[in-house]
Amino acid sequence: RKESSAASDVYKRQEFDQYLKRLGYVFKNESKEIGGYAILKNKKIMLIMDVGDSPSNNFSKFYQSGALSFEIISNGKKLITNSGYFTDKKNKLNKFSKSTALQSTLSIEDHSSCDYKKLDKFSLIVKKGVRIIKRNTIFEDNYWKISGSHDGYLKKFKTIHEREVEFYPEQMKFVGFDKLQRKNNSKNIKFDIRFHLNPDAKVMKTQDNKSILVELEDEGWKFNCESYDINIDNGLYLGIKNSYRENQ
């Protein structure tokens, strides 16, 4: 299990509400799902997870391989984020922005959960998509949970990725759990779990490599992982039209 007390800007909460209202979306069921995303929120926190299948090939030009990736927004500031979409198709960053490595989720052996193929000189579409096998959402005053699993690594690695993210509002604490369900455990596989941060966040790792302290404006959060060491790497935030910023 990985624990995070974490803080969080793709949409500010009010902007996101207006966006949903403009599109005519109204939550009418307990799944809290819109367009393949589970969205849980209160006045301070918003938790968003990608729990939808990849689109069919003809509608996948803008798809990014982010199955079970999630974002956290706290008081209108995004902490945990995906890295954004680079719109200039002639730039190699466009292809890069589609990869699973740029989403806040798990990847295996540096592969994305989807395969892509060329539609024309510059456009890529999904060749082999990803299917969400199961998903579940719990939204109560003092307990939230979004969970799901996908088959994006089933063919290559005979592996199902399962993820759940819990939130305890009274404690302002997130708890996450990732599991690789494998049909054949005889061969070790390398996996990475990435959490991309707001480029304005300041981070510091503790000496035991088990915790990271995150400062974002007037909020401070602590990310813990007891089972594995945590590394801080430099990355790119592409959520700026045809531009980017460095993040971690």
Segments (PLM) and residue ranges:
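CBM-like, beta-strand-rich accessory domains located in the C-terminal region of large
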Residues: 1, 5-8, 85-248
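Carbohydrate-active enzyme catalytic cores, enriched for enzymes
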Residues: 1-81
